[in-house]
């Protein structure tokens, strides 16, 4: 089967199989701010501050920098991401490394390294698939754990009169070393709202099913992320 078709079917299946139980769960609010600085044509740095509740975690604050390296943009990707302010979207391949300090009340602080490899695939009719492969390498004063996350996103820019917004759906399963299995699945439905040339909002709904512990945990989040984009390219 075509890998693109497999991706679309996977996202649709995961939403249909876990969407109904989500209605019975409480909803939490997850804020986030990412500030991006384009250094040159192939390097970009950003600082992220996020209320991190991934994989069944309690209320946590995650903050830290990342550095991205990407290849030259493809014409097809540039054409379908014209109105998206994220400069990495037109790149077929993006390498990233980051550090996060993760803190929570009553818990040991976590030092996390985040190596990431992301692929972008242009589709017909203006659709874009993003395949993000990320590892979370977590150290505390007492232990080391790791997990692997694979986030598949399907999006398309839509014109509403003269304004262009970008709705999307996504699925992200986690393999957690401490449970020795694929223990968590996150499902997303959201929309990106560009505002001017430096600001973009990401408003989304997230349903998480965590089978790492018994009984299973199901969490629903409403997320609001603020993305700020600046270019230092050519400045002294």
Language model segments and positions:
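Residue-level signature of outer-membrane beta-barrel architecture
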Residues: 37, 69-71, 83-88, 119-121, ...
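Repeated loop/turn-to-beta-strand initiation elements of outer-membrane beta-barrel proteins
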Residues: 41-47, 74-78, 92-95, 124-129, ...
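Start-of-domain marker
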Residues: 25-90
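Transmembrane beta-strands of outer-membrane beta-barrel pores
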Residues: 49-55, 99-105, 121, 135-139, ...
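Outer-membrane beta-barrel "beta-signal"
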Residues: 68-70, 74, 117, 218-236
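Bacterial N-terminal signal peptides
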Residues: 8-19
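Residues that define the transmembrane beta-barrel architecture of outer-membrane proteins
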Residues: 27-29, 59-63, 109-113, 144-150, ...
């Amino acid at each position: 089967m075509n890998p693109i078709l497999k991706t679309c079917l996977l996202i649709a299946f995961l939403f249909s199989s876990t969407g109904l139980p989500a209605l019975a769960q409480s909803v939490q609010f997850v804020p986030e701010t990412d500030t991006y600085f384009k250094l040159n044509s192939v390097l970009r740095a950003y600082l992220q501050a996020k209320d991190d509740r991934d994989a069944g975690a309690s209320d946590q604050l995650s903050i830290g920098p990342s550095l991205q390296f990407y290849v030259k943009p493809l014409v097809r990707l540039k054409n379908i991401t014209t109105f998206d302010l994220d400069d990495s979207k037109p790149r077929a391949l993006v390498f990233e490394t980051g550090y996060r300090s993760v803190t929570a009340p009553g818990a040991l602080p976590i030092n996390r390294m985040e190596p990431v490899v992301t692929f972008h695939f242009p589709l017909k009719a203006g659709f874009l698939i993003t395949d993000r492969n990320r590892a979370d390498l977590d150290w505390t004063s007492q232990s080391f754990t790791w997990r692997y996350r694979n986030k598949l996103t399907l999006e398309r820019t839509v014109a509403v009169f003269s304004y262009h917004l970008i709705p999307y759906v996504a699925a992200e399963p986690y393999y957690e070393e401490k449970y020795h299995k694929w223990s968590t699945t996150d499902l997303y439905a959201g929309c990106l709202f560009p505002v001017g040339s430096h600001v973009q909002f990401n408003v989304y709904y997230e349903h998480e099913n965590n089978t790492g512990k018994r009984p299973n945990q199901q969490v629903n989040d409403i997320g609001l992320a603020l993305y700020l984009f600046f270019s230092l390219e050519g400045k002294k």
